[in-house]
Amino acid sequence: MRYSNIPAGVFRNRFGFESLPDFSRAVWQQVKTEADGNIRNLPPGLIGGSDVAAEAVSAARTNLMGLHNGNNVSVERTDFKKLSALKEHVIVANPPYGIRMGSDENLAVFYKALGDFLKQKCKGSAAFVYFGERQYIKKVGLKTAWKKPIKAGRLDGRLVKYEIY
């Protein structure tokens, strides 16, 4: 949405400010028309995604259907280890974590595999990975560029940036 200059609240039918006493429908229409005129097309292939869960892929595709040029975003059901090289990309990942999965089994192995994928197939990229549990950050095996605390529900997680060389 940001790349395409799609205004926030584009799917809303009504805003609270429309009930204010000095609200002007003419001014609002002018602002809305100007914002809509600044929308630009999303080139095919600029954004893509994947997940191993069919439900997640289906939800992403459904959400994209209502978005301007959402059909230019490819979402596939596949394991990240099977993806082709993502050199000089921006990678955003919200991988599984123990609390969300209900189990800590094999997560250390998973995060090591994620780190190996980033090192081997993502040269020149920046990766932003959300960790619901901080103890797995070191399992990736890459030096962090920075870590930012992010609360998601009861999770005291971290968004971590990796610069892959």
Question: Where are the language model's segments positioned?
Answer:
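Residues immediately flanking
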Residues: 80, 95, 133
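Short glycine/proline-enriched coil/turn segments at helix->beta-strand junctions
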Residues: 85-88, 123-124
